[in-house]
Amino acid sequence: MARLPEKTRGIARILHLDDAGARVELDIEGMRRLFDELYAASMEEQKESQPRKDEPPLREEEVEQTDAKGKVKRKKYFIYKVPVPRAGLLLDHAPGANDAGLWVKLWRDMLWRTLRGVPATRLPFIARAQGTDNGDAEKAWKRLTSKKAGTVQLSSTDYLGAMDRNADGVSFEDAPREWFLLHFWPYVTQVHVPRALKLKDKVIQEEHAGFALVIPDVGLLQSFCEELPHALRERSTEVSGFRPRAALVDLVEESALMTGRLLRERLSQTEGARAYSALVLGYELAHLDKEGNNVRTYSASRFEPTVSMVDEYQALQHPALWDPLFRRTRLQNLVGGRPWYAGFDRIASTLPYTATFGAKGFRHDARVSFERNKDMESNESAATGPGLEQLVLQVARTYVGRKLKLKHGMEWDGVKDDPKKKADYEKEKERIARDAFLAVRSRTGPDFIAYFAGTLCSVPHHLKAEQFVRLSRALHERTEDVRTLTLLALSATA
């Protein structure tokens, strides 16, 4: 509303705004202005691969395309005029603030494929694009000013998941003023693109899987209105394919962590963590996509990340994790409040070797995770020596290093300046670590304990007595944790 020009028809202004709420003043002309801004759109040309049944194209175009085999083919496209939402509020807050911005395009694509995926729901935008009036402002004015107490039936466009009647025969209804406010929530919703993982040719691959919507539950209204625009302008403009790289997420919950990180960074220099914790109480999350003519809701939940969780997520970004499966598992553990290494034993046991130890990205991420764990160990742990994670890593590294020296006479200091010897060293190191990884993967319970004690600990280790006792106790009392850490430590050592 603050964006509307002052010297124009009608009344549409904010009378009061604070952290507890807002009061606005509207008349019928001001309502029309507000809705015209809300649903502003223009008719623009768009290429389509198939002709429409009941509408001739403006023209046809042929474009040369090169397929995967390098063969050049000509593909015909059909040009039509289509309505495109302007989203002026989002344009003002987008990095670069222009129509070509990928963040705004992402929001428009989401709107047209999900919230307005059914053509009939696009009528407010189509009317503005064609310069006509569909009467929605008058309808809203009538409902808001009616002296009769009543409710308004909600559609799925107003409220995600709403329907005429649910399975129990209950309709979705709300007070007129609440229905009026529901017109605006899409414009503060942050949109991201979840990535699904699939195993193809024994390698983990990623593909886009719809849209993740993040709807903030605002705790301090005025502060949020002041800080959100600044945070949105600071989003990265780096591109991955045809989407902003920062919009791609491995979990739907990561969308909320990203939004929280933006706001946290914005507030960190002036207000601190306490201000962020009060600014947003939580996030409503939805995972949507369009399948054929139907819009599917894959999940809907509420997520309330703590300040420490947002900070830990920020730490996960530097250095970046390379492997999509490793990254997703780390995020699942963060969101679930589990140790960072939880679940990797199951992954190693159920997926092909090529998707775990055999993937360079997986080994890189294991190294990075152990290094980060070392940096984050508490002062108490530092006073008593390394924690369990670092003890297991030390065992794995010592075992591989000793085997290299005993079997091949190789040490790092003797090969680091000779490219050929260095390559041979790396090859043999990976082979020794791989054999141990596969041996651990195939053993559980007592069999793993016997292998760990009889093979990995068969070479001299420089462990202090209390460290040896701690490791021995964990081997018997936390066998699965030690096994998981051993798999990761061998991956990190290769």
Short names for language-model regions:
Residues 53-54, 59-238:
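Basic, glycine-/proline-tolerant helical and adjacent loop/strand elements
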Residues 1-95, 257-494:
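Long, contiguous all-alpha helical interaction modules
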Residues 155-334:
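Domain-exit/linker segments immediately C-terminal to small folded modules
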